């Protein structure tokens, strides 16, 4: 992973984190990206669970992220609350607070449902077919600007490969492609400076990709998502995470989009987003 991060901790108060320029979203230069907000929810939930139990005993089966206020590029504080502490089920709510001078405002509410890992059942259950794409090489070097199809722009905050060709691409350049979309995604940034980024945190960020993957039209992305719901049966293995369009539907300016999520060993879950129509599309 390249030596960049989305956030840095405040030197005088480690409970406060500051977004870096890498955390800027595509809709407004003063607005944080939805993917990093998803990451913050998982960051807070993982820290809270680790404080009360052995985190490896549980699987984050569902992550929900509600983004209901403008996420300004301001300092943030993460508040967490254990709402259920059972032996098999633990639920942790996460509140992302924007710290603006003396005013603290909640901009995101998330929840993570943790289920105790046990053994699989013995019966056979029907499952839909999975994609059949070879994952990228573990040794594939990170791209630089010279190899990207967006000359003159900074390196993206994640890398995207076409599973069919193995070549890198930018989804916004795929408006002429009509039909289901697929991609392999690899993170290029650390989440918080000098802190390890967990596999769950990585896939939580990728979950936000359901919006452009499912909702991209022939003229650009015309919906901004207001939430993310991620379901996982296990965490991803390896750096590359695969995504595949599962559903798109829209009516009266409200959209729903979803995608399947894979790693090198197969499907691991799915992500769904609800969106609002934007008067100006993101191209």
Where are these regions (language model features)?
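Terminal targeting signals and extreme-terminal segments of soluble enzymes
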Residues: 1-283
